[in-house]
């Protein structure tokens, strides 16, 4: 699991910097196995950028999803997965991250087993999205 914990770390920091304390941010992966170590390259990229993403992997589950006000997914198949594990009445909470944050059709692709530059590109995409999310929340 690489992108979700990085997005969580970025968003937590941006919200804190904006003085927004009423939002709880968590992450989970649709393909993750609970309790594994995080991706080493993503840990390195995150640390270089000053983000804290320590912890273990966590698989997305229906109870956590139902308890969430907003579920942001990296790729369309994640949206489908999430819609498959929660009741239809909660589907309105599920969105593609880049579409919800920036109105963009971009997808945040999985950098696993790719060069470090690809990880850096994912970091930049997530920073843009998390900045936009922070601004949206701050305006509410």
Residue ranges and their predicted role:
Residues 1-68, 135-140:
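Conserved active-site segments centered on acidic
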Residues 4, 75-76:
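Helix N-cap/beta->alpha junction signal
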Residues 70, 76-140:
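Phosphate-binding/catalytic loops
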């Amino acid at each position: 699991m690489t992108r979700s914990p990085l997005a969580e770390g970025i968003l937590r920091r941006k919200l804190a910097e904006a003085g927004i304390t009423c939002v709880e941010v968590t992450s989970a992966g649709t393909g993750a196995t609970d309790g594994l170590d995080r991706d080493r390259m993503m840990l390195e990229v995150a640390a270089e950028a000053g983000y804290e993403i320590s912890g273990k992997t966590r698989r997305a589950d229906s109870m956590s999803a139902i308890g969430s006000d907003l579920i942001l997914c990296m790729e369309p198949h994640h949206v489908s997965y999430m819609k498959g594990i929660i009741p239809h009445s909660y589907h309105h909470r599920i969105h593609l991250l880049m579409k919800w944050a920036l109105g963009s059709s971009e997808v945040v692709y999985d950098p696993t087993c790719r060069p470090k530059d690809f990880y850096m590109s994912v970091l930049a995409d997530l920073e843009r999205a998390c900045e936009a999310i922070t601004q949206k929340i701050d305006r509410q």
